[in-house]
């Protein structure tokens, strides 16, 4: 351990020495940089090195001295001397050049004298331990006049003075010869004459002004340049100046876009959907494409197809607007609960806990399996290698009971008595046995296994699987893992192996908010054939102006409104006199204008947004923000508002309301229109007015309550008119219910009978019309020269005797209903009913009923005729069939007419039976009971019977 400590201390010492050496090198470099001017001017190196040694001693870190920046000199770069040779003029003559050179030679010795005098006046700067020298630096401008150059050249050097600030830093104040002056002293020196300037300076009193000679002013001839190049340079300089000023002064951000040359740099103007629909309907592109004389491209056809799609979409939008299904509000963005940072629901918390419990149970199960595997492996090693694989432990001392008694006797002080009782032989035997056990344990614990020697298991039992264990396979399960127990290859793999952490909250937030970067900043297509152009665009976040939304270019030309002003529903005019004016602050007006620009005169939405800022507090009348009040305030704010700009179904009502409000405002002194106030007009805004309105409403309510009529306590109260009626018994209740059911049944029967009479009357009218048509057709058939159909066609034997149909119906009814004469119709009515039914069936199912209806519409009705026989009806049917289908033979036509007649008669008989049976059921009903008190004769119906009656009524109706 001592060797390791020595090695560590030596390593630390070498590191510290290297750090200190590097620090000293840096300080030395800083020192030489501060004395760079002296080295260039050829100063004394020995003195500079001594100062360097002192500087390093002052900033020695081993002596706990930190670096002090004031110990360094401030470095002042020396400007290179300008060329004093004046520019030669192109038009100068050799004579002038000679005079100029001669004057310069005469002036040089005088200048040297003045410099010497100036150097004598320089006072060296004294510091605490060292001196700082400052050499003068001469500046000369080419092309300066003598008046400007002379005072600058003869300015005396000022003495730099160092002052120690409160923070301990030395600040150098002063100036050196050659430093540039500000513009103000130069301008003052120009205005004053040279002699006054020189006399005011104290350094010029030692010099003779007459010795100073003026140098000639160099003359520069203007060079000829091309005017085209000058204009290009001027425009470029102006553009750069404007761009710089625009980027810096305006403070606006700009974006540089790289795009194709064919792509338009400006966005296309937005056209309203109504204008697109109007243009597509009046002048569609699909009609203009075929007559074109130039070449047609795919883009033209795509444009025409897009126009059709726009038309379909706009019509669908208009349909949804009419149905109030087109919302102007954007639905709220769906937040995925999985991506939220915290589970907001109970189910989310339960899932999170279940996820951790699953991981905990799974890992704990694996840990138990690994512990069991390790324990089983340890047991196998113990039985295989013996106690050599066990850890070192203290040996177990097996003591008998007598020894324990000896120990107890020692503690109690009775050892002498116990030793006398135990014999010396037993005690000696016990001690020898204990020594043997201790020797055996020590031998087992001290036995070690050499790493080179092989360990053989005792031959207790042989296992054939022991040969596989010779390969020395690693254990499957491990309860721990160390980094040193891994191979180098596995270490490199583990360094790059990603650790599964699940979906973190930060990653979910990053996935949700994807940053938007213009594609032109990161991607440039190299295999593109087009030229690229660079465009600079300003990012303007200004809100649209108030006037910009109210006016726009027309649908085709001129100025029209971009959104027609559709006012909301106006309130009733009868409440106009009692109207309270609303108060609008500047903040409310600003919010109103912003919402109008954003939602384009959707007054319901604007009113909801403006009134939502009030919250759930009390809202007085002066603070209400209904859609109409927002519209009224908008009319006041917009100076260019005109009544004719309003469109829509509510425009007339709004115009009338505004006219009446203006008229009423002129008649009375009280204000009813909205009032705009500022923070300076009413203290604390309009809160005072709000509370005043509250107290006014309370005062009115109290006054109304006081004026309300009160009950007179002296008047006795009228007793309640309660009719004393006896409670009916169950028998009476059942009787009343039976009477009610009977009346309802009678009313139903009467309704059905009335319907049947109306139906029979209609059938009778139709039968008369059919008979008239048949009578009209009979003389036409006789006037024809052809022989009658009875001579051509043999008579067909009918299945029943030839008698009128009415008589047959009467006989059938008499057979079916013998003895019924109360409610059954008479024989005359029955015959009429049968005729009506037969006529109706003939009209509905005969093949020529269309021609008969046409004939009846033209011929006026005649008097009553004889009823037709069965033979005549069959022959008339046969003639109609032959007229419609000439291909049929007379025999076939007679057979078809006879079968058709039989079917019609069967249907008429069934209908007649149904008609006769209904009055019969009404007649057989017994008379209802009287309203007397004969309760014993009436049986109360059971609930089941009542339900059956209700169902029967539903079926009948």
Swiss-Prot record:
Pfam families according to UniProt: HSA, Myb_DNA-bind_6
Record keywords, A-Z: Activator, Chromatin regulator, DNA damage, DNA repair, Nucleus, Transcription, Transcription regulation
GO cellular component: NuA4 histone acetyltransferase complex; nucleus
Subcellular location: Nucleus
Biased composition (Low complexity): 762-792
PROSITE patterns the record matches: HSA, MYB_LIKE
Region (Disordered): 72-115, 160-196, 703-804, 922-957
Entry keyword Transcription: yes
CDD domains from the UniProt entry: SANT (cd00167)
Domain (HSA): residue spans on this chain: 334-409
One Gene Ontology term from the biological process aspect of the record: chromatin organization
Domain Myb-like: 576-638
The keyword Nucleotidyltransferase appears for this protein: no
Biased composition (Polar residues): 89-100, 184-196
One example GO MF annotation: chromatin binding
UniProt biased composition (Basic and acidic residues): 102-115, 734-750
Described function: Component of the NuA4 histone acetyltransferase complex which is involved in transcriptional activation of selected genes principally by acetylation of nucleosomal histone H4 and H2A. The NuA4 complex is also involved in DNA repair.
Subunit comment: Component of the NuA4 histone acetyltransferase complex.
Family: Belongs to the EAF1 family.
Protein name: Chromatin modification-related protein EAF1
């Amino acid at each position: 351990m001592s060797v390791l400590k020595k090695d560590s201390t030596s390593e630390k010492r070498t590191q510290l020495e290297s750090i200190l050496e590097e620090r000293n090198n840096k300080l030395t470099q800083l020192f030489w940089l501060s004395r760079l001017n002296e080295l260039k001017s050829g100063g004394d190196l020995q003195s500079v090195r001594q100062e360097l040694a002192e500087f390093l001693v002052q900033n020695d870190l081993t002596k706990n001295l930190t670096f002090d920046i004031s110990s360094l000199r401030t470095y002042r770069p020396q400007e290179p001397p300008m060329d004093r040779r004046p520019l030669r003029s192109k038009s100068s003559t050799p004579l002038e050049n000679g005079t100029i050179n001669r004057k310069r030679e005469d002036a040089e010795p005088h200048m040297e004298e003045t410099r010497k005098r100036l150097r004598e006046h320089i006072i060296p700067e004294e510091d605490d331990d060292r001196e700082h020298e400052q050499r003068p630096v001469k500046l000369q401008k080419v092309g300066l006049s003598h008046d400007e150059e002379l005072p600058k050249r003869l300015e005396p050097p000022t003495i730099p003075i160092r002052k120690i600030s409160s923070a301990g830093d030395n600040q150098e104040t002063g100036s050196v010869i050659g430093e540039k002056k500000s513009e103000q002293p130069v301008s003052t020196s120009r205005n004053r004459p040279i002699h006054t300037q020189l006399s005011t300076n104290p350094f010029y009193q030692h010099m003779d002004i007459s010795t100073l000679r003026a140098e000639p002013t160099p003359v520069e001839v203007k060079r000829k340049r091309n005017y085209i190049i000058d204009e290009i340079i001027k425009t470029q300089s102006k553009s750069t100046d404007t761009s710089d000023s625009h980027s810096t002064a305006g403070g606006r951000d700009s974006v540089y876009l790289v795009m194709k040359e064919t792509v338009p740099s400006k966005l296309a103007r937005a056209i309203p959907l109504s204008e697109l629909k109007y243009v597509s309907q009046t002048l569609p592109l699909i009609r203009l494409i075929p007559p074109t004389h130039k070449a047609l491209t795919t883009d033209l056809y795509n444009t025409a197809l897009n126009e059709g799609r726009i038309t379909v979409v706009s019509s669908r939008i208009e349909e949804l607007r009419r149905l109030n299904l087109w919302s102007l509000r954007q639905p709220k963005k769906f937040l995925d609960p999985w991506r939220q940072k915290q589970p907001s629901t109970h189910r989310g918390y339960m899932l999170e806990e279940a996820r951790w419990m699953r991981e905990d149970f799974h890992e704990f199960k694996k840990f138990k399996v690994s512990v069991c595997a390790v324990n089983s492996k340890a047991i196998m090693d113990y039985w295989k290698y013996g106690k050599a694989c066990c850890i070192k432990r203290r040996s177990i001392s097996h003591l008998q009971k007598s020894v324990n008694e000896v120990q107890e006797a020692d503690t109690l002080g009775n050892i002498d008595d116990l030793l006398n009782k135990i014999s010396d032989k037993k005690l000696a035997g016990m001690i020898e046995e204990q020594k043997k056990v201790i020797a055996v344990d020590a031998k087992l614990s001290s036995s070690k296994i050499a790493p080179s020697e092989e360990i053989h298991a005792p031959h207790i039992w042989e296992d054939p699987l022991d040969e596989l264990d010779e390969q020395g396979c690693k254990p499957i399960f491990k309860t721990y893992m160390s980094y040193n127990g891994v191979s180098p290859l596995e270490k490199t793999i583990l360094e790059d192996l990603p650790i599964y952490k699940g979906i973190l909250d930060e990653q979910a937030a990053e996935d949700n908010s994807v940053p938007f970067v213009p594609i032109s900043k990161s991607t440039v297509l190299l295999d593109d054939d087009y030229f690229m152009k660079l465009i600079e665009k300003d990012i303007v976040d200004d809100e649209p102006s108030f006037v910009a939304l109210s006016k726009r270019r027309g649908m085709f030309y001129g100025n029209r409104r971009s959104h027609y002003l559709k006012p909301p529903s106006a309130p009733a005019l009868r409440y106009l006199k009692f109207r309270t004016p609303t108060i609008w602050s500047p903040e409310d007006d600003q919010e109103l204008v912003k919402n109008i620009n954003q939602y384009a005169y959707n007054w319901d939405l604007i009113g909801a947004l403006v009134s939502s800022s009030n919250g759930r507090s009390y809202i007085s009348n002066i603070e209400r923000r209904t859609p109409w009040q927002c519209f009224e305030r908008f009319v006041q704010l917009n100076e260019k508002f005109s009544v004719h700009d309003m469109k829509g179904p509510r425009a007339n009502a709004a115009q009338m309301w505004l006219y009446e409000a203006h008229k009423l405002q002129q008649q009375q002194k009280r204000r009813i229109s909205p009032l705009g106030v500022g923070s300076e007009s009413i203290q604390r805004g309009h809160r005072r007015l709000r509370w005043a309105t509250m107290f006014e409403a309370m005062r009115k309510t109290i006054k109304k309550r006081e004026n309300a009529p009160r009950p007179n306590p002296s008047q006795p109260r009228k007793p309640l008119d309660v009719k004393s009626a006896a409670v009916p018994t169950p028998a009476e209740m059942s009787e009343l219910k039976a009477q009610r059911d009977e009346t309802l049944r009678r009313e139903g029967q009467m309704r059905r009978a009335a319907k049947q009479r109306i139906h029979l009357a209609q059938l009778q009218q139709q039968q008369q019309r059919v008979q008239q048509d048949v009578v009209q057709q009979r003389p036409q058939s006789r006037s024809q020269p052809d022989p009658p159909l009875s001579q051509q066609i043999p008579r067909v034997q009918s299945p029943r005797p030839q008698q009128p149909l009415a008589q047959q119906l009467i006989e059938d009814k008499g057979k079916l209903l013998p003895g019924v004469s109360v409610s059954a119709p008479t024989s005359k009515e029955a015959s009429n009913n049968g005729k009506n039914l037969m006529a109706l069936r003939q009209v509905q199912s005969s093949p020529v009923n269309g021609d008969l209806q046409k004939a009846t519409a033209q011929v006026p009705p005649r008097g009553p005729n004889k009823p037709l026989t069965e033979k005549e009806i069959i022959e008339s049917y046969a003639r109609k069939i032959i007229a419609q289908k000439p291909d049929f033979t007379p025999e076939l036509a007679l057979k078809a007419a006879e079968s058709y007649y039989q079917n019609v008669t069967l249907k008429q008989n069934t209908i007649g039976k149904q008609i006769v049976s209904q009055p019969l059921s009404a007649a057989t009903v017994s008379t209802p009971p009287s309203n007397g008190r004969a309760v014993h004769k009436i049986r109360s119906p059971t609930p089941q019977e009542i339900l059956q009656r209700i169902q029967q009524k539903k079926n009948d109706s």
